[in-house]
Regions:
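Active-site-proximal catalytic alpha-helix in oxidoreductases
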Residues: 122-131, 151, 156-186, 194-208, ...
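NAD(P)-dependent Rossmann-like dehydrogenase/reductase catalytic/cofactor-binding core
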Residues: 2-6, 10-13, 19-22, 27-31, ...
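Redox-cofactor binding/interface segments in oxidoreductases and associated redox assembly factors
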Residues: 63-64, 93-94, 172
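Short glycine-rich anion-binding loops that position phosphate/pyrophosphate groups of nucleotides
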Residues: 66-70, 96-98, 265
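Rossmann-like NAD(P)-binding element
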Residues: 36, 44-90
Length: 304
């Protein structure tokens, strides 16, 4: 078992690095921020420090938030392992979509490697996914998840590496079909969002994906799968419509145009509103869950 996690090194101080540093510092972890801009940082979380070179004292957990590039992240890993060759430093990547198997190829100790997937805004979003690297043990995942939970987060533990973690895979599976329906003229973006907001998402809020099918009846669901799944859009490539929109600079709220017209809308105001409304919804769901009947235990079905 790895040593207890008390000292955390945050490598990179962009939006995500800042938010995650705040969560660890606020929870009482000794938090050091490694950034080339260390001397100019003025917004450090209380109790944290910033350095422009790796500190002499080895951290227990080092979390990198470098750009989403395999080579860049691997260079950070090498730098950390070279600085602390005789210490059992756990290295975590903050990637949301890169392959942990590929990232781990540069590591001397891949058995100490995990993925941590935070959701924006990372300091207030309640959930973090903790995923095993290709050589990491169940115990290591649980060990890191326990430290993350100490910062006030709920954790989803994934014991095998999988590109995209859990939530992104589910989200992209739904979105890939949604973009296909828009691209082929079956439904508009507004129609899809209306259906999601009025029924699909509320059902998920209350019963998730899988339990809802138990409630509805797996026999009905299995019958529907036989006719619907073969008709779903499976082409294995990113949606061309979406890629073309981004190439034209139509990236959504930030540029004023995406699937919706955001002309005249203030980016910070809109994002703050979305975060505020999500927080209010989560508070409501927490209250609802406290009053609800205990959930039935999930069965541990053997993997195929």
């Amino acid at each position: 078992m790895s040593r207890e996690i008390h000292n955390v090194l945050i490598c990179g101080y962009g939006v995500m690095g800042q938010a995650v540093a705040r969560t660890f510092a606020a929870a009482g972890f000794r938090t050091v921020i490694f950034s080339r801009r260390a001397a100019s940082l003025t917004d450090l979380p209380p109790g944290s420090t910033a350095v422009n070179c790796l500190p002499d004292a080895a951290p227990d957990l080092a979390i990198e938030f470098a750009s989403e590039d395999v080579g860049v992240k691997q260079a950070v890993f090498r730098h950390i392992e070279m600085a602390y060759p005789s210490n059992e430093v756990i290295i975590a990547t903050g990637t949301s979509g890169l392959d942990l198997v590929e990232l781990a190829k540069s590591l001397v100790h891949p058995e100490r490697f995990v993925g941590l997937h935070y959701f924006m805004p990372a300091d207030t979003s309640p959930l973090v996914e903790v995923m095993a690297g290709p050589s990491a043990s169940v115990e290591l995942v649980d060990h890191v998840a326990a430290a993350v939970a100490h910062t006030g987060k709920e954790t989803v533990r994934l014991y095998k590496p999988m590109v995209g973690f859990l939530l992104n895979r589910l989200q992209h599976a739904i979105l890939h079909e949604a973009y296909y329906l828009i691209d082929t003229g079956v439904a508009s973006a507004a129609d899809i969002d209306h259906a999601a907001r009025r029924l699909l998402a509320p059902r998920m809020c209350l019963n998730g994906l899988i339990r809802q099918k138990d409630i509805s009846g797996l026999n009905i669901h299995a019958d529907a799968q036989r006719s619907i799944v073969p008709a779903l859009f499976h082409n294995g490539i990113p949606n061309p419509m979406l890629q073309a929109m981004v190439a034209r600079g139509e990236t959504g709220l930030a540029t004023g145009k995406g699937f919706y017209d955001w002309t005249g809308r203030d980016v910070k105001t809109e994002r703050a509103r979305a975060s505020r409304e999500l927080a209010a919804l989560l508070d409501f769901l927490d209250e609802l869950n406290r009053e609800a009947e205990p959930e039935p235990p999930a069965r541990n079905l053997p993997p195929r």
